[in-house]
Amino acid sequence: MTFLIASNILLWIAFLGVTVVMLGLMRQVGLLHERSSPMGAMITDHGPDIGDMAPEFDLPDYFGRSVHIGGASERPTLLMFTAPTCPVCDKLFPIIKSIARAEKIGVVMISDGAPEEHARFLKNHELGQIRYVVSAEIGMAFQVGKIPYGVLVDGEGVIRAKGLTNTREHLESLLEADKTGFASLQQFMASRKKNAA
């Protein structure tokens, strides 16, 4: 009888151990899934299409300086839709600055939210040449559903690339899309397949 009780207790301990290990594995798979983002910026099918003229806006930035979005400009402009409370946007900010310098493009960060959140965000980040605009209207015109979201507009005001930009690779894929003429990595791969056939 004592043997049966001891074996039953050992089985329950083993069962609980396997359960703990399984929960740990599930957590690790979840973290791995979260970290392995898709290659290239994920394009949503909402808003103006690639190749369309970008909607035009003339409005003040956070500091009251005039900003023109869309239409002809001296250089390409990256419109980054962000939020002051978005942790991914916070991580991307130095990357956006470095890419803007390296690629010699203009950057307009477009955000929405409470004034105190913007003040806190701007207190912690040096903008440099980046313009910071608070406008829900622009986000609605581009039909941005998730952030951070990037739209690359060329010097003639045409949308060259757009997509969800969670990592440096996603941001760089927007610029590569403009350089190669392919709107997305998927379009590039499809053209290679077509040429090979």
From Swiss-Prot:
Chief location category = membrane
Give GO BP annotations, semicolon-separated.
methylamine metabolic process
Please indicate if the UniProt record lists Membrane as a keyword: yes
Q: Which residues cross the membrane?
A: 3-23
Report the protein's function: May be specifically involved in the processing, transport, and/or maturation of the MADH beta-subunit.
What SUPFAM superfamilies does its record include?
Thioredoxin-like
Q: Could you tell me which pathway this protein works in?
A: One-carbon metabolism; methylamine degradation
Naming one, the record's GO cellular component terms include: membrane
Q: Does the keyword Glycoprotein apply?
A: no
The lineage's top-level taxon is: Bacteria
Among the GO molecular function terms of this UniProt record, one is:
oxidoreductase activity
UniProt topology in membrane: Single-pass membrane protein
Protein name according to UniProt: Methylamine utilization protein MauD
Pfam annotation, one family: AhpC-TSA
- Residue ranges constituting the Thioredoxin domain according to the UniProt record: 48-180
Which keywords are on file for this protein?
Membrane, Transmembrane, Transmembrane helix
Question: Where does the UniProt annotation locate this protein?
Answer: Membrane
